[in-house]
Amino acid sequence: MSKEHTLSQNISRVNFKELQQIIKMGLVQGNLIPAFAGAWLAVVMTNHSFLSSIPQILLMLLGSTLIMGGACALNNYYDQDIDRIMPSKQNRPTVNNRITDQNLLLLSFGMMLVGEICLFLLNIPSGVLGLMGIVGYVSYYSIWSKRHTTWNTVIGSFPGAVPPLIGWVAIEGQISLTAIALFLVVFCWQPIHFYALAIKRKDEYALANIPMLPSVKGFKRTRVSMFIWLIILLPVPLLLINLGVVFVVLATLLNLGWIALGLTTFKKNSDQTKWATQMFIYSLNYLVIFFVLAVIVSLLTLI
């Protein structure tokens, strides 16, 4: 059996786990939480019928999943050269030739096309926001800023914060102050989250010549930046006062807990990675708790 035939067989047998890696399903799932919360809050706060809104919510979630997965697949296509250098990326199907470039591009553009159709079927603003997210993530982040500036994480935070806007607009048809507040939560959250991850992988990024802030400016500078974003995030819950004082207080306590963790002192440089890991884990829990809390509190207003 020829080497080419064996490779062809491998490519045709990409399993579900590998497909999840290609479309970065973990990242997609994380972004679906604020997308759903945006749609749910639009239903509750603008007095839409929940039952009649279910088809819209499901179509929004499907469309969002497809455009995010497609954009991530395209990111994997473009990043193959640096992924081959970074040890943590060696199991990606794009690195070990489990999928051809042609099939990867077909998957990517196919998902994004169908996803955009879903969003435009909802309304034009949802489709436009989806396009903005795709263009921002693929071009401004993946192709340009990721490889050229330490501001890459902040630049990537703009398209990364689009999901709650799509969720809200899918129901209401236009952006409101509440939708902007949800956008700001995700926008401010991302630098803290990804800087923590970058601290853990700073040597890998340096090896691949990717100008992540910890690799270029060092730990202290990155920690200061994370603290600045924590301070910016602190008053954002006040914009969601429509959810009630209880929500604002709980969300603020959640922010203060993160700030307290960020101010943790340590004696050894080896503790930097441990601190970054703790900040990273808190960030994962933060996003879930914040938006689940918003949904629960909004439910209480219906009682």
Swiss-Prot record:
Pathway: Porphyrin-containing compound metabolism; heme O biosynthesis; heme O from protoheme: step 1/1. It is found in: Cell membrane. GO terms for biological process: heme O biosynthetic process. It catalyses: heme b + (2E,6E)-farnesyl diphosphate + H2O = Fe(II)-heme o + diphosphate. It is a multi-pass membrane protein. It comes from the Bacteria. Keywords: Cell membrane, Heme biosynthesis, Membrane, Transferase, Transmembrane, Transmembrane helix. The chain crosses the membrane at residues 25-45, 54-74, 104-124, 125-145, 151-171, 179-199, 227-247, 248-268, 280-300. One of its GO terms (cellular component) is plasma membrane. CDD domains: PT_UbiA_Cox10. GO terms for molecular function: protoheme IX farnesyltransferase activity. Its EC number is 2.5.1.141. It is an enzyme of class 2 (transferase). Carbon 2 of the heme B porphyrin ring is defined according to the Fischer nomenclature. Converts heme B (protoheme IX) to heme O by substitution of the vinyl group on carbon 2 of heme B porphyrin ring with a hydroxyethyl farnesyl side group. Belongs to the UbiA prenyltransferase family. Protoheme IX farnesyltransferase subfamily. Interacts with CtaA. This is Protoheme IX farnesyltransferase. It comes from Staphylococcus aureus (strain bovine RF122 / ET3-1).
